[in-house]
Swiss-Prot record:
This is Tryptophan synthase beta chain. The keyword Disulfide bond does not apply. Gene3D superfamilies: 3.40.50.1100. Tetramer of two alpha and two beta chains. GO terms for cellular component: cytoplasm. Pathway: Amino-acid biosynthesis; L-tryptophan biosynthesis; L-tryptophan from chorismate: step 5/5. Its cofactor is pyridoxal 5'-phosphate. It holds the Pfam family PALP. The modification N6-(pyridoxal phosphate)lysine is found at residue 91.
Length: 400
């Protein structure tokens, strides 16, 4: 199969598209044109590759997790170490690319939303690097949960706006960031943090994150002489997963597994499992699976991990699900916390809570596979930002 999506209108099957007010249509089309031009511009690509190597620190290692593999008792588990990027997560792969695009369009200001704060930090970082003015919108709840990242963004020169509307989380931060963009569209570029939003954002973010899968594919071939049997990544909006999945999409022997946040359980109201529990709707400029009530009102997503509690999911993930190309699963808060501790103790790596969801499912999956098989898990970020939150939760049981 040769996979080609999106179509010229930005649709992935019935998902995606461009549902934006007239005031943004010009900006979105301008972005589309600049992005298409940049793909065939050798100077742009050279500069992008320079910053990915010299500033971000790519390529990231593909690490054989020997002890974790022994614990699972099945397939070999390789970790794609996106936690080793500058700023500690995969987010910067995308913000570097979009900042260069903004500069090419002559825009000196950037705006972004953030949940866990990782995308905010990555945006503030590239804004400092390229001397741009930066405004970050963050839900008030997330500001409390991730106060360290707020301070980091301010250190980097960004203005952080705490959003008090709605559920005061990521969804509301996106709403406010989009409003801000509408009002300042002439000199401001919106750096979308995931494979979400109106076309061409899902495609742009996918392409900048695809460096994950391109490297992992090459590295696994070098180490094992074959492609992995499975690849696994956590899914909130879904950019680290799409970055890993997309370069493998035509390799049908490779199973692709996305892992959503089940929060307190799918049977409760407290989860962020959009693919499992969502229905098609329009959110933030695109048609996607959305958590909604019977009246079409957007529900609040819930997860211990601030980076996964988004009530929608990138349109291409829903398309993969419909095609049967990827399978989507969910992992509860408790299971993620258990996997967090497991990776700390088996490999000496403190993972982000987001990535811990992928680790949890990967260990289960590996145990059902044969020792001669192998998998790649995207370790999308490091867990420094989560240690404080987990300290409160685990105090007293850590040495039990």
């Amino acid at each position: 199969m040769t996979y080609q999506a999106p179509d010229e209108n930005g649709f992935y099957g019935k998902f995606g598209g461009r549902f934006v007010p007239e005031t943004l249509m010009k900006a979105v089309k301008e972005l589309d044109e600049a992005y298409r031009a940049s793909k065939t511009d050798p100077a742009f690509q050279k500069e992008l590759n320079y910053y990915l190597k010299e500033y971000v620190g790519r390529e990231t290692p593909l690490y054989f997790a020997e002890q974790l593999t022994a614990h699972a008792g099945g397939a070999k588990i390789y970790l794609k170490r996106e936690d080793l990027n500058h700023t500690g997560a995969h987010k910067i792969n995308n913000t570097i690319g979009q900042a260069l695009l903004a500069r090419q369009m002559g825009k000196q200001k950037v705006v972004a939303e953030t949940g866990a704060g990782q995308h905010g930090v990555a945006t503030a970082t590239v804004a400092a690097l390229f001397n741009m003015e930066c405004t970050i919108f963050m839900g008030e709840e997330d500001v409390k949960r991730q106060s360290l990242n707020v301070f980091r963004m301010e250190l980097l020169g960004a203005k952080v706006v705490s959003v008090k509307a709605g559920s005061r989380t990521l969804k509301d931060a996106v709403n406010e960031a989009l409003r801000f963009w509408v009002a300042n569209v002439e000199d401001t570029h919106y750096i979308m943090g995931s494979v979400l939003g109106p076309h061409p954002f899902p495609e742009i973010v996918r392409d900048y994150q695809s460096v994950i899968g391109i490297e992992a594919r090459k590295q696994h071939l070098e180490k094992e002489g074959k492609l992995p049997d499975a690849i696994v990544a956590c899914v909130g909006g879904g950019s680290n997963a799409m970055g890993l999945f997309y370069p493998f999409v035509d390799d049908v022997s490779v199973q692709m597994h996305g892992v959503e946040a089940a929060g307190h359980g799918l049977e409760t109201e407290f989860h962020a499992a959009t693919i499992s529990k969502g229905e098609i709707g329009i959110l933030h400029g695109a048609m996607m699976d959305v958590l909604q009530d019977e009246n079409g009102q957007i529900l609040e997503a819930f997860s211990i991990s601030a980076g996964l509690d988004y009530p929608g999911i990138g349109p291409e993930h829903s398309f993969f699900r419909d095609l049967g190309r990827a399978a989507y699963h969910s992992v509860t808060d408790d299971e993620a916390v258990e996997a967090f501790q497991l990776l700390c103790r088996t490999e000496g790596i403190i993972p982000a809570l987001e990535s811990s969801h992928a680790i949890s499912y990967a260990v289960k999956l590996a145990s059902q596979m044969r020792p001669e098989e192998s998998m790649v898990v995207c370790l999308s970020g490091r867990g420094d930002k989560d240690v404080n939150q987990l300290k409160e939760r685990l105090e007293g049981q850590i040495n039990d």
